[in-house]
């Protein structure tokens, strides 16, 4: 029987001496008895073994013959092999679809057959199984399928529902078949949900509950499922990536899994955008507004470019989507507008253009103020020209700050309340203009979006300091009219406080130029790296301050006890020769000494320990504390900071192009709208365009209360709805094209991989096996059903 089951094995040349001896012929210390401790199932009969072997070899005629001869029912058609696979499972794994149909017709059952077919991605088997299942009166839900599949009597090996498994495999064809069965998916609850269902599941099995949530999100993040079930796949990918990123911060045990799913959603949105073939499709995608977003009715009627989808991508931090080549090309076109020829000019002409606009920016601003709708005004309205004009205005403001320090009057140095100079009034005009610009951005963007930008935060702090400076100067001028030496002034005199705030505001004003580096492909990545390093330094600061505070408390408590006079403080503990050493007798002094010691700015003699007879123990403890501080901070924490900064820089350098393009897009978007066209201080002057808008809005409001006005308003709303519906239809048409191209590109990638080659080999093997069995059956080579066990020589 052994030779029959394993015909390729030759045991004739194996001597009995080479085989291991039985345990009975050897001592117990020389052999180890092996015993199967697992559940032993009933041994299959010879017919059952033949039945399973025929299914494995894909012999359709032999399987059919065995099933036809099983009229008495002696053969268990649901028998399993040593691996726990029944005939249906074996047939699915071998992709023998004709045998699968035959087995199902004869009533072979398998609880996890559909799961095996989905896991093996055998589309034909899934189609056969779904069509063979009896129709039910009620719609099956995923919860019911889960309960049925996870029933212990089925002994299934997969703890997942069919549609979830198909989504995990990202198989578009199988998902299409399953969704036609009217299945549903349970909506995942939040991590901290305290509803009755979540509390019961979490109490019963918290691991299963967390794993089920992860499986659901794996299903929802499947690109194939998103394309099939969502009308707006890009928006759904944005929302899912944000939810998954939030989940990765809450469920830290599965952080890597959730981060990988979030990355998958981002890459899907990027790849879908990459399928756009012309500017018209890009314009439809990037300007699409979802139903939940606020609409600009005037911009919609005037067919203005709002780029709402691109703004949403920046809000959701979709760096891959924004930095995609098609998106960047479209942004470049919008950025230069009517000055598209600027990019093709030589470098010298580019510099001359920028310098000319930078010098004559007041004249250009006045021209736009007078005639904003003219051809010249439209050129100024392009984002690139707005950027140059706003930059020139800010450089003029910095020049005024430098002039302010140069024209400082020494005669008024001791004046307690000096009057404002002419240059002060010019600075106030600029500051009011910058504040008005920030107020308009705050109004249109909202507080949350406004504060997300570090550039807006810096501008807010800077303008607040300037306002406080000039307010204190006005207070000092109205309250103080005397002259006195500065050393006699109060420490918090309004003039002194104003000068301090003004100095700090000047520092921030120049640091604000860093954000202009974002437009440069050379300086931009460096500016982004510096921002990331500052964030990492903030994390390091929390650890460093704790260590500094700990050692400061210890040294202060050690050296400030029992000493009240300077004579007693001389030469005590850690010693400083020839000068009074009271460094560690106060909290502030100890903190300063330990801080500056990191930069080698503290005198070395401070940390020399003097051992005397009376203070030997105290001096030794102080030396140990300072030595430990030296090791922990100077050696360990400082090197840790260097490693953190190097890691941050390397992380930005590895994704330099993506990070820079994303930061540049954020800067460019702030110049795309028509809310802040004029720079400070011209933006505080009411323009004719603003006056016309106000008059038009007022007249519309007045006319809306008349009968003709109401009819006109209804017609306008109807026109707006029709235009919105037309835009939505165009978006759906473009999205269908993108999905079709995406599926085609994915299919081409699959055909070029090794996996596709293996599938082709499997198909070829099945065809050859089928052909062999048909030839044998026709020629009558198989005279007995046991010929598979006893092949002819």
From Swiss-Prot:
Q: Which reaction does it catalyse?
A: Ca(2+)(in) = Ca(2+)(out); Na(+)(in) = Na(+)(out); Li(+)(in) = Li(+)(out); Cs(+)(in) = Cs(+)(out)
Alphabetical list of Pfam families matching this protein: Ion_trans, TRP_2
* Gene3D superfamilies named in the record: Ankyrin repeat-containing domain
BP GO terms, sorted: ligand-gated ion channel signaling pathway; phospholipase C-activating G protein-coupled acetylcholine receptor signaling pathway; phospholipase C-activating G protein-coupled receptor signaling pathway; positive regulation of insulin secretion; saliva secretion
Cytoplasmic topology ranges: 1-345, 380-386, 440-455, 518-536, 645-793
Where exactly are the transmembrane stretches of this chain? 387-404, 423-439, 456-475, 497-517, 537-558, 624-644
- Extracellular topological domain ranges are 405-422, 476-496, 559-623
Spans of ANK repeats, please give.
46-75, 83-109, 111-156, 158-180
State the InterPro entries in the record.
Answer: Ankyrin_rpt, Ankyrin_rpt-contain_sf, Ion_trans_dom, TRP_dom, TRPC1_channel, TRPC_channel
**What is stated about the way this protein's activity is regulated?**
May be operated by a phosphatidylinositol second messenger system activated by receptor tyrosine kinases or G-protein coupled receptors. Also activated by intracellular calcium store depletion.
Region: Disordered, residue numbers: 1-30
Gene Ontology CC entries for this record: basolateral plasma membrane; costamere; cytoplasm; membrane raft; plasma membrane; protein-containing complex; receptor complex; sarcomere
PTM comment: the record says:
Activation of PRKCA induces phosphorylation of TRPC1 and subsequent Ca2+ entry into cells.
Q: Which residues lie within the membrane without crossing it?
A: 346-379
Which regions are flagged for Low complexity bias? 15-28
Listed under subunit, the entry gives:
Heterotetramer with TRPC4 and/or TRPC5. Forms a heteromeric ion channel with TRPC4, with a 1:3 TRPC1:TRPC4 stoichiometry. Unlike other TRP channel proteins, does not form a homomeric channel. Interacts with TRPC4AP. Interacts with ITPR3. Interacts with MX1 and RNF24. Interacts with FKBP4. Interacts with PLSCR1. Interacts with PKD2L2. Forms a heterotetramer with PKD2 with a 2:2 stoichiometry; has distinct channel properties separate from PKD2 or TRPC1 homomers alone.
Q: According to its UniProt entry, what is the function of this protein?
A: Forms a receptor-activated non-selective calcium permeant cation channel. Forms a heteromeric ion channel with TRPC4 or TRPC5 that has reduced calcium permeability compared to the homomeric TRPC4 or TRPC5 channel. Also permeable to monovalent ions including sodium, lithium and cesium ions.
Query: NCBIfam families, alphabetically?
Result: trp
This protein is called: Short transient receptor potential channel 1
**From what organism does this protein derive?**
Mus musculus
